[in-house]
Curated annotation (Swiss-Prot):
<dbReference type="GO" id="GO:0003779">
    <property type="term" value="F:actin binding"/>
</dbReference>
<dbReference type="InterPro" id="IPR043129">
    <property type="entry name" value="ATPase_NBD"/>
</dbReference>
<dbReference type="InterPro" id="IPR020902">
    <property type="entry name" value="Actin/actin-like_CS"/>
</dbReference>
<dbReference type="GO" id="GO:0010631">
    <property type="term" value="P:epithelial cell migration"/>
</dbReference>
<protein>
    <recommendedName>
        <fullName>Actin-related protein 3</fullName>
    </recommendedName>
</protein>
<dbReference type="GO" id="GO:0007369">
    <property type="term" value="P:gastrulation"/>
</dbReference>
<comment type="subunit">
    <text>Component of the Arp2/3 complex.</text>
</comment>
<keyword id="KW-0963">Cytoplasm</keyword>
<dbReference type="GO" id="GO:0031252">
    <property type="term" value="C:cell leading edge"/>
</dbReference>
<dbReference type="GO" id="GO:0005524">
    <property type="term" value="F:ATP binding"/>
</dbReference>
<comment type="function">
    <text>Functions as ATP-binding component of the Arp2/3 complex which is involved in regulation of actin polymerization and together with an activating nucleation-promoting factor (NPF) mediates the formation of branched actin networks. Seems to contact the pointed end of the daughter actin filament.</text>
</comment>
<dbReference type="GO" id="GO:0005885">
    <property type="term" value="C:Arp2/3 protein complex"/>
</dbReference>
<comment type="similarity">
    <text>Belongs to the actin family. ARP3 subfamily.</text>
</comment>
<keyword id="KW-0206">Cytoskeleton</keyword>
<dbReference type="Pfam" id="PF00022">
    <property type="entry name" value="Actin"/>
</dbReference>
<dbReference type="GO" id="GO:0016331">
    <property type="term" value="P:morphogenesis of embryonic epithelium"/>
</dbReference>
<dbReference type="GO" id="GO:0005737">
    <property type="term" value="C:cytoplasm"/>
</dbReference>
Length: 426
């Protein structure tokens, strides 16, 4: 069967989790931790030489002895070393990454790679050399017929189109991508990332979990120590929200606590006895560290709204309004209730204050045009990058712009240094 008749495989490799599935679907078929459990000697940096020695000695079976995803973190892999091939979005161990992709394709997707085109994602500022390594693995190890490497921020912009009118769809915008390990603010102009203006915020989902864990540790002694992180993570996902004003929220809880308090019920994994946790201020203080980072990190005190405003002011002047008008949220850590509303309010205040200052400094001669700040949240926000890839890989034009195996054999891996933004995006 022609590889054009079968849907493309879309794989979004993140620091914490990997999303994989087939093009045309609205959600990934599998979401698994980006972890791989291997035997110690294979996990060493000299893994290729060790594997060669094993094969010569007839012990190459060790090469196949590994787990990925949830299995890598399960008790069954307790005698293995757990490795994370991706750090801050960038692949650091290509040998382990190849084995990880191997099981993604054969065990999870159950696909023959020779029969499917592949769309893989990359973080902003990924190096051209990393694209070449990806191409070598995909074309030489898996013999794929075609490959396209897409920037995650552009796919997140594309995913936001589903909830908007065709006339409102734009490839100029600011993507706030906040996952488990890091938050990126990425400006995109006409489908291309403005690399010099990207900002990294050292606060993400994991930091919120740690912050809630510390708050609970101070007053809740019923939580088993070995379960405190998972309890904090569950509380974050079930009960947390963003409030418009922290001080007023404290007053609300103190005035009528029964209305706002929640209870988390759990089972001690060792004694099997039930325990309960009262969840109060943690509900709104957790996500608040995006807007008041000094709550948890004294070395970083810039609110996310200030970072966004500063970033946009550093971009070329002709795209600034387009960026303010299209701030798109992506990733699980942007899913808190009212996160978009508060972010829009705070960025609007900053931009209005700047316009007011310009008018004052001009003595009233300048009347700046108001800036329309729009923060876009949508149903596909959690898996925005994967969904954007699924949308693009299901178009006929995807097959025309993907790099083919024949191209690779003729020109080498350098062809994948450039992946054009194609018509479906423009």
């Amino acid at each position: 069967m022609s590889s054009h008749q079968l849907p493309a495989c879309v794989i979004d490799n993140g620091t914490g989790y990997t999303k994989l599935g087939y093009a045309g679907n609205t959600e990934p078929q599998f979401i698994i931790p980006s972890a791989i459990a291997v035997k110690d000697k294979v996990a060493s940096s000299n893994a290729q030489a060790l594997r060669w020695n094993n094969r010569v000695g007839g012990a190459g079976i060790d090469d196949l002895d590994f787990f990925i995803g949830d299995e890598a973190l399960s008790p069954a892999a307790s005698n293995y070393t757990v490795k994370y091939p991706i750090r801050h979005g960038i692949v650091e161990d290509w040998d382990l990454m190849e084995r990880y992709w191997e099981q993604c394709i054969f065990k999870y997707l159950r696909a023959e790679p020779e029969d499917h085109f592949f769309l893989l994602t990359e973080p902003p500022l990924n190096t051209p050399e990393n694209r070449e390594y990806t191409a070598e693995i995909m074309f030489e190890s898996f013999n794929v017929p075609g490959l396209y490497i897409a920037v995650q921020a552009v796919l997140a912009l594309t995913a936001s189109w589903q909830s908007r009118e065709a006339s409102d769809r734009s490839l100029t915008g600011l993507v706030i991508d906040s996952g488990d390990g890091v938050t990126h603010c990425i400006p995109v102009a006409d489908g291309y990332v403005i690399g010099s203006c990207i900002k990294h915020i050292p606060i993400a989902g994991r930091d919120i979990t740690y912050f809630i864990q510390n708050l609970l540790r101070e007053r809740e002694h019923t939580i088993p120590a070995e379960q405190s992180y998972e309890v904090a993570k569950t509380i974050k996902e079930k009960f947390c929200y963003v409030c418009p004003d922290v001080m007023k929220e404290f007053v609300k809880y103190d005035t009528d606590s029964s209305k706002w308090l929640r209870t988390y019920d759990g089972i001690n994994s060792i004694t099997k006895r039930p325990f309960s946790v009262d969840v109060g201020y943690e509900r709104f203080l957790g996500p608040e560290i995006f807007f008041h980072p000094e709550f948890c990190n004294p070395d970083f005190t810039t609110p996310i709204s200030d970072t966004i405003d500063t970033l946009i002011q550093q971009c070329p002047i002709d795209v600034r309004r387009g960026l303010y008008e299209n701030i798109v949220l992506s990733g699980g850590s942007t899913m808190f209730k009212d996160f978009a509303r508060k972010l829009q309010r705070d960025v609007k205040r900053l931009s209005d204050a700047r316009l007011q200052m310009s008018e004052t400094l001009s003595g009233g001669r300048l009347k700046p045009k108001p800036i329309d700040v729009q923060v876009i949240s949508h149903k596909m926000q959690r898996y925005a990058v994967w969904f954007g890839g699924s949308m693009l890989a299901s178009t006929s034009e995807f097959y025309q712009v993907s790099h083919s195996k024949a191209e690779y054999m003729e020109k080498g891996p350098s062809i994948c240094r450039y992946n054009p933004v194609f018509g479906a995006l423009t």
